[in-house]
């Protein structure tokens, strides 16, 4: 049997593509464009895992397909290389994070090239390259000039052991840090913020203009969290103080029986009575130790302390006790709520716990038993009695505005983006603080502001980044003699990834971020493929920066990514014991088709789980490429199932894909190739071209491969293979298995040219039509024969063909035919006696 040698074929074609710049981005202005983008990776020390190539293979197939269809292709790759892991490694080993990062990038690039992706490496970007982050800094200065980057004292999640603040997303529910499991405390610090809230409405509205999965759009909508309601002002009894509450249900104001302020609310200390001062101070201390996530957990027990003060309900003059409780966050809304316990579960539980009044203002339910959270007509509500929800909201807003105690208000859950990190390994923020109290942005002519090389990258301990220790970099003097200090905070890893897709379009431009004409030519990105874990933050931040650049006239489109696709996760083989605990693969043995724990002998259940080092089930693509070849890995990952499904890795599936490619190789290299078309494969070949073309376009790669298998099976039944069909088939499989595609193309054509630019095959519609049809012949209601006849034969012709058939004649010999019923294209029924 013939097998192809991937160890010879794959490096040969990879060298050919590199030497000939086969995948250089097309610049022919007469061609349509196609921009296929992968979410660029963080180059970790662990290297590529088999999950990475799934998305990369998908965009590569699309790029190769569109290239053959005559498009200019932009298909680039780069590195999101700033970030905490490199800094942590550098601190642990004493190495420079830049050196560590460069080594990791070289390894990633080697692994990626071994998989045969058609990237244009002339466009490679690296977020840690000063020539790249010059423009990240330039964008920051534009945000600063527009008032969209500002400094504020904000409570942050401070981790003493890490010497930095961390984002809400990096705090675990138990209030410790995701990295290291260290205690997290809330403390106010001077931070840089980006005013993403100024773009909230546009970020929401423009989701309608993009072709994204609805689930991702919903996640962004929920994150932005638009709600329309009213602001209501409550005066504090016996003081000149007041506070504002935002509510989406101003119609329930008659049912507000108490108010709750966040422990951090500015008013708390001013209104707390002497009797309550100690209890309030103690509660505030406890609250500062909890993360926002822990504080707002619905399942947790409600805690709170009365301030001793009362607010006056503006609509009925009733006194409402003012409490503080940690489930109200200072960073959300106004940091104060009016509680309507009859119609809100959290307020109801709080009121029951602390014996506060519960007054129903909507008809229905029994508020002694539980909060009534459905809609009903208004009761106990004065001028709103008898009204439904919409009418009552409108009437109450009208009343609040007329009385000067409130107004209609649209709010968003979205918060401004905390943009500073107290770390070394990030882009320096290009701002100088002068001793006269002013701050200025570093002028464009002085960008990039390069990150200084320093041995001492440990956190400073003062809450500033390690850059505070680099005195000669830190201290500057103006021409007029005024001294200044550079900003010591660095940007978060999100910064470089918020605009990298723009730099690929014009990566070597030293004068501007990218040329306007090139941006016009290539934007928006046609397809963006990556993991759903970036659904909210990265995509929201990139959309925000894009809109700012649109307003500045830098980019020509409102949205960066026209179509988004999230590939599923490739799960590892893993095993569970009877308690449901996962068992590492090196502790498992297989006996008679079942799996057992090596140490305990317990039979285990196979259960796919996320690949992880601890379960020892991470599959390294290097091993797969060595044993089976890159083409096998590519075909297997596309054939596992739908691209957006999460599916378990299987060695058997990998072997199956390799066997299929060997059959393809044998078909083209050992079958007699002829210039004469017998017509036997007309239908299946044209069906295959049509199906593969449509399915690749729709990213249904698994069904496209299934159709290629159908063709191979059909072709193997024939003695000879028509040359045009052999070539067309090789073109169809080349995007999936590009090394094998190139090798077989040379076997058929000896052209010496890459298959990459050969025009994609077309199909003949007339060959898809069935000219023959199978009919059944029944005698006494039982099927006695199946005949293939020309389509649309008349009843008379069908009867003639059926009665002439040998099997039928044997059945009816010596019998009387009572009648013959013929149904064209279906059956002939013969009634005999």
From Swiss-Prot:
Residues spanned by motif 'KMSKS' region: 610-614
Cleavable signal peptide: none
GO biological process, one term: leucyl-tRNA aminoacylation
The protein, known as: Leucine--tRNA ligase
Keywords (A to Z) from UniProt: Aminoacyl-tRNA synthetase, ATP-binding, Cytoplasm, Ligase, Nucleotide-binding, Protein biosynthesis
Taxonomic lineage from the root: Bacteria, Bacillati, Bacillota, Bacilli, Lactobacillales
Domain of life: Bacteria
Enzyme Commission number(s): 6.1.1.4
Gene Ontology MF: a single term: ATP binding
Organism: Streptococcus pyogenes serotype M1
Gene responsible for this protein: leuS
Chief localisation class: cytoplasm
